[in-house]
């Protein structure tokens, strides 16, 4: 399990680098009030975005390895580290001063995540999910994701639109991870031929691409304080739920649940606090007017 956590943390680091570069690229192309495939064409002409995609691909490879060695309910929450890592990487790349308030938020995320994972400590589970289990999973997850996208399209550019699109992307990310874990289980059990013949392999690639498109759109739709918490927290919670329900991973219960809730509350506070800091917005190369005005007083 320790190896899975390390690989997941490396995947989060690679994804954070990709996010920093994608965010910068997304703000250099024309914004739109609708979902347009031309956005991808514009981004493909942007070298910075292509470099970000390399980071995302490396992240996917590391994530697949992490899922092969560990449970979905452990691996997916580790991606919460992507947010503080974006602060560290973006600060180094763009020479942004990180305030004391931002480092406090990072500490809350790290401690909260450690407490959450230690308290849950899921055990057991299976390496892949039989086909019939995927029918309700895909219908429910896809239905909620579609509802979020439709809700976003009915709203103007701003907080609600960005949050809905980011939450939809997060659901897609968690579902991609669940499908990826099954594909890796098939690879380990039946070999390369079965891996490339399984529908899960192509499903996780397609849903992952859709999630990437939704995330790029969410980045244009509104401020970071709306999109980042929705993306980060929805991904983690959905990953745990899918791990327990379809992979039959068994978290600890009893008093451990109280500690897990406390840990999740602490990391949630850290995510929202960090998302409100101006230095994170600058690290992701945005222009956030909604950042906490008190931050400069505590820098």
Enumerate the language-model features and the residues they cover:
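Polytopic alpha-helical membrane proteins, predominantly small-molecule transporters/carriers
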Residues: 1-299
């Amino acid at each position: 399990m320790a190896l899975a956590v390390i690989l997941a943390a490396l995947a989060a680091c690679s994804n954070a680098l990709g996010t920093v570069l994608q965010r910068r690229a997304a703000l250099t192309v024309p914004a739109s009030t609708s979902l347009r495939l031309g956005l991808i064409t514009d981004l493909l002409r942007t070298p910075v975005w292509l470099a970000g995609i390399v980071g995302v691909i490396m992240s996917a490879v590391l994530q697949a390895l992490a899922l092969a060695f560990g449970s979905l309910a452990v691996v997916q929450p580790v991606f919460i580290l992507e947010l503080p890592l974006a602060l560290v990487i973006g600060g180094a790349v763009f020479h942004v001063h990180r305030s004391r308030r931002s480092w406090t938020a990072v500490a809350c995320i790290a401690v909260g995540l450690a407490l959450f994972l230690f308290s849950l400590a899921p055990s057991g589970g299976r390496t892949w999910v039989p086909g019939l289990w995927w029918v309700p999973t895909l219908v429910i997850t896809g239905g909620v994701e579609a509802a979020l996208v439709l809700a976003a399209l009915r709203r103007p550019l701003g907080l609600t639109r960005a949050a809905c699109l980011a939450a939809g992307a997060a659901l897609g990310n968690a579902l991609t991870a669940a499908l990826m874990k099954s594909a890796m289980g098939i690879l380990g059990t039946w070999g390369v031929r079965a891996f490339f013949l399984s529908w899960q392999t192509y499903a996780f690639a397609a849903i992952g691409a859709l999630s990437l498109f939704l995330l790029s759109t969410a980045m244009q739709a509104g401020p970071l304080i709306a999109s980042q918490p929705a993306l980060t927290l929805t991904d983690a919670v959905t990953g745990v739920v899918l791990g327990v329900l379809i992979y039959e991973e068994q978290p600890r219960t009893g008093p451990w649940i109280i500690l897990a809730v406390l840990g999740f509350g602490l990391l949630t506070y850290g995510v929202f606090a960090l998302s409100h800091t101006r230095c994170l917005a600058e690290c992701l190369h945005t222009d956030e007017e909604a950042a906490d005005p008190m931050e400069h007083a505590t820098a």
